[in-house]
């Protein structure tokens, strides 16, 4: 399928929203499995499906509100993103994050105050979970899109956002309003030649700054963010 946009020219818009398993703190798929084939690892919070235990009932597929558990009709097992846990165990970022040419994906632990995830989620509050109203406490966070300025009927720049804020609230909840204000203010600081820790973090000139997953002991959950 070809990409399509929303809105009317010249203010039409589209953006990409990478989707992966959220490795939720309260995964609905885990609760739905009658044979306890789905489990959450204590050491990093990654949610996995035990392929030996899975009986292919597919209750987990229907339970996940993000539709991120699929059924393998060949193996007759439910499967999902494993967050590349063998790589994480070796201190290497998941393949989707490490190979991203746009340097858009950050990987780290929420409990690591010096890591990128904690700064984006807690310090700057610009990284938000998708559909927080589902109540599963997802551990993948998104920095909302900041698109070019829109135009008014006379073809002049308008203060109206190109992506309707109402739509972003639908995706990321009410916290997106303040996140957009913060992002806009920090972008203006950077344009004016002033320092901005947030913009430097998101620009990620050093790719290693995207990842901070080694030598961290946690018990609740890992986190990922995409900008």
Task: Say what each PLM segment does.
Residues 95-227:
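Long, compositionally biased charged/polar accessory segments in the mid-to-C-terminal portions
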Residues 52, 84-86:
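Short strand-loop junctions, especially beta-strand C-caps/beta-turns
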Residues 79-82:
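Membrane-embedded catalytic interface detector for glycan/lipid assembly enzymes
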Residues 22-24:
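Extracytoplasmic Gram-positive cell-surface binding/anchoring modules and repeats
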Residues 1-20, 58-69, 87-95, 123-147:
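Short Fe-S-cluster ligation motifs
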Residues 1, 26-53, 58-76, 92-114, ...:
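Iron-sulfur cluster-binding cysteine motifs and their immediate structural context
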């Amino acid at each position: 399928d070809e990409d399509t946009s929303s809105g009317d020219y010249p203010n039409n818009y589209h953006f990409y929203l990478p989707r992966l398993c959220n490795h939720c703190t309260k995964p609905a798929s885990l609760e739905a499995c009658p044979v306890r084939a789905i489990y959450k690892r204590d050491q990093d919070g990654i949610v996995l499906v035990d392929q030996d235990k899975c009986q292919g009932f597919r209750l987990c597929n229907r339970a996940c509100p993000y539709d991120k558990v699929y059924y393998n009709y060949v193996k007759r097992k439910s499967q999902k993103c494993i967050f590349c846990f063998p790589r994480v165990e070796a201190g290497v970022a998941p393949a989707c994050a490490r190979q991203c040419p746009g340097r858009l994906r950050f990987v780290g632990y929420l409990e690591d105050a010096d890591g990128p995830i904690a700064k984006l989620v807690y310090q700057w509050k610009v990284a938000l979970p998708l559909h927080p109203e589902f109540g599963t406490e997802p551990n993948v966070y998104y920095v909302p899109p900041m698109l070019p300025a829109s135009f008014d009927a006379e073809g002049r720049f308008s203060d109206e956002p190109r992506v309707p804020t109402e739509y972003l609230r639908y995706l990321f909840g009410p916290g997106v309003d303040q996140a957009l204000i913060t992002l806009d203010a920090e972008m203006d600081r950077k344009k004016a030649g002033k320092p901005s820790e947030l913009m430097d973090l998101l620009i990620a000139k050093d790719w290693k700054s995207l990842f901070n997953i080694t030598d961290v002991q946690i018990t609740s959950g890992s986190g990922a963010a995409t900008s």
